[in-house]
Amino acid sequence: MKAKLSSDIAYISLYLNNIGGGSAIFCVQARTITLTFHYICTIIPLTIMTINKEIESGDRPLNFLEEIIEESIAKGETRVHTRFPPEPNGYLHIGHAKSICLNFGLAKKYGGLCNLRFDDTNPAKEDVEYVNSIKDDVRWLGFEWAGEHYASDYFEQLYLWAEDLIKLGKAYVDDQTQEEIRLARGTVTVPGTDSPCRGRSADENLDLFRRMRAGEFGDGTKVLRAKIDMAHTNMLMRDPILYRILHTDHHRTGDKWCIYPMYDWAHGQSDSIEKITHSICTLEFDVHRPLYDWFIDELQIFPSHQYEFARLNLTYTIMSKRKLLQLVQNKIVSGWDDPRMPTITAMRRRGYTPAAIRAFADRVGVAKRDNVIDLGLLEFFVREDLNKVAERRMAVINPLKVVITNYPERKTEEFECVNNPENPEAGTRKVPFSREIYIEHDDFMKEPPSKYYRLSPGKEVRLRYGYLIKCEEVIEDANGNVTELRCSYDPASGGGSSSDGRKVKGVIHWVSAQHARRAEARLFDKLFIRENPDAADEGETFMDYLNPESLVVQEIFTEPSLGAAAPGDKFQFERVGYFCVDKDSAPGRQVFNRIVTLKDSWAKINK
């Protein structure tokens, strides 16, 4: 019942996030309060029955994008074509995963298409390595694109359209420096001032622009700007830059081009070329939409439409590519795939499943306002999926040796163990048992409190799938540390019962000392100790909130069946947590990454 209740609480949080635009944040007296499981449980009078019905049926409220699409369908506009347009200058993170799931998910739900388009307009920062990693991430999440496109595919068409704007008197070449352009743009309260070059004739601008393409000018000496309105209330409409000169080879076009389009120029026109119906961006691009529409209207091309939703923000997590790069460069983490990073490749290595990420992305909803999602929600979905698919194994993280004094010294037997109680088809396995075993240090207390059901002097406990044992003697070192236990066993208590019918509440896991395999466990935790590491106090940075215990490396003992596990295989170490075999594993020396604990230990610590 307790486990079921925790699941219900998590779903209440997700349910609320889909109501009224999807905000999971309430603002009370100018303070932003992020809803956590415990907070929701105490303040929200929703019944468990209502939530369970929604979960079982698979229904949830429509998000605002689905409402827009369904309204269009009702009017006969049935075509849905979306796109996911990453810039290939880094690795995707969990925020991108939400966008991937949204764009591909909408296309699938409404029988449409979703393109993968690389926004490769900045050759100085882009690389084919990132292109390949992005494709791997999208496929790993379970999606296949309708078409693979690149903004660079459209460089010629974008150039010709730029010439069209020049001929229409809607664009001009500017000789001002970047700083001069910035200062002349004005502020939100002060109008901008026209460039001295704004009055050039169309013929002069066309000649200069063609010479820019021919490579006659140096980097930064000229730009092409749209001629809109230097007094516009939206500063992005104050003659935005369309092209800049950059003598840098492109990873696809080589040295063919020395002028490159800016994002705002390439974005909407690429959408139009691909006949995208729903161009979905994050909220910060809301102010870009008037410019997006202006270009399409002036060129009189296919009218794609831009819509904005709130980006994903997670507690105890940073998403800034610049800050993530700092972590890598300063060797705070081992690389972009360090399992503590929020990148998709890191989550994959850690052992997160695509199904869990898809379920999380679906349930957090699509908001119109910025919100912050508790990291525990993501971990909840990871546990839910792994509980269904991960086979059970026994492993001891902090071993304490136990000698069963009345068990024959040379005897070995095997117990039949269930691989996954959630899936009968997973079958069973044999686990060896012998006179000496290892148990968890935490499963023994010399002076236990009341209602302590694990092992203590003179008390009995059941070994998982095995016998009842009783602690007869405690061996300590010179400092009083417990180093070994001497126990007796009841030979008639195998198979989960006892000859006299006595009941023993405590059940602990174990491994046979004779058969155990040594392995390395990497116990990962949150990378930051502050809920919002981006909100640094004066004189501090996000680096000041690093969790010194985000990685603990431990030598462990595992049951022998784990010797056949391969990198990427996932297991539940019974009573410990979920673990994944890491790529650093070598013959005779396996490495296991802790994916998540069995329970939300962080919430307990911070009560």
Locate the predicted segments by residue.
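Core subunits and conserved enzymes of cellular information-processing
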Residues: 295, 364, 372-607
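Long, charged, mostly alpha-helical binding arms that flank functional sites
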Residues: 303-381
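A glycine-rich helix N-cap at a beta->alpha junction
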Residues: 131-152
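N-terminal catalytic cores of NTP/NDP-binding nucleotidyl/phosphoryl-transfer enzymes
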Residues: 58-70, 74-135, 251-282
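Conserved short loop/turn motifs at secondary-structure junctions
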Residues: 85-90, 117-125, 147-156, 179, ...
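Active-site cores that bind ATP or allylic diphosphates and position pyrophosphate for catalysis
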Residues: 120-122, 128, 150, 164-323, ...
